[in-house]
Design a protein with these regions (language model features):
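Extracytoplasmic/secreted proteins, especially bacterial periplasmic and envelope-associated proteins
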Residues: 6-9, 32, 36, 55-58, ...
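Contiguous beta-strand/loop segments that form the cofactor/metal-binding neighborhood of enzyme cores
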Residues: 62, 74, 79-83, 88-219
Length: 219
């Protein structure tokens, strides 16, 4: 699978070529890309599926059955977490020995220039300039190549890589859909390695019409 910043580009190219698409989560790198993918899939008429492997997990299907039959009574609070507790779990992956500019196509990794421009414009318009690295993007970096999940320039962070699994599981079990509100906090509190993506995240989701709150935490 490609890095997050390539997902929508590949999905749209495949759809325009008339290919049905199975896209690993996350669907996109930015919010605008999400709508772009939706439009292209609609226009081309191909079959599209977003991949969450948890959909095949027996315990989630059993939980849906139990809650759906009312065996637990009203559910008002959901708590889920992702705790990795190791450098590898926090995306500090090994750098393959001998890797260099002659063995890695950096421009190809960086992605479509138009997508990059749209990303820069999106981040700037949302006053998130401090999280982007326009200077670093043009510089070859083994850390960024092998550990790309640590930078917003290529990644969707804890939410796009890990929370997405937990949220999909909850949605599969309880059919919660889109929440009324979501509030997050966190930061880069442990891995002081230059990353821009938080290594600690707390998110609260609210569904007032269902008297339901979901708490998510990740480290």
């Amino acid at each position: 699978a490609g890095p997050d910043h390539w997902h929508s580009t590949i999905a749209m190219a495949a759809a325009r070529a008339g290919k049905h698409v199975y896209c690993e989560k996350p669907l996109s790198w930015t919010v605008p890309e999400t709508y772009m993918v939706r439009q292209v899939i609609k226009e081309t008429g191909v079959v599209f599926q977003l991949g969450h492997q948890g959909r095949q997990t027996d315990c989630y299907q059993k939980a849906e059955e139990i809650i759906g039959n009312g065996l637990l009574g009203p559910v008002n609070l959901i708590e889920v977490c992702t705790n990795r507790n190791s450098p590898n779990g926090a995306w500090v992956y090994d750098i393959i020995e001998g890797s260099n500019p002659n063995t890695i196509d950096w421009k190809q990794f960086e992605g479509d220039p138009e997508r990059i421009k749209e990303y820069m414009d999106y981040m700037t318009s949302n006053k998130l300039e401090r999280y982007i690295g326009p200077d670093e993007r043009s510089k070859f970096s083994l850390e960024r190549f092998f550990r790309w999940r640590c930078w917003w320039d290529y990644s969707t962070g804890l939410s796009g890589d890990l929370l997405t699994h937990e949220y999909d599981a909850v949605n599969q079990i309880m059919h919660v859909g889109i929440p009324h509100s979501a509030t997050s906090s966190g930061g880069v509190y442990f891995f002081k390695d230059g990353r821009t993506v938080p290594d600690v995240l707390q998110t609260t989701f609210e569904w007032p019409d269902r008297d339901l709150t979901m708490l998510y935490s990740a480290t």
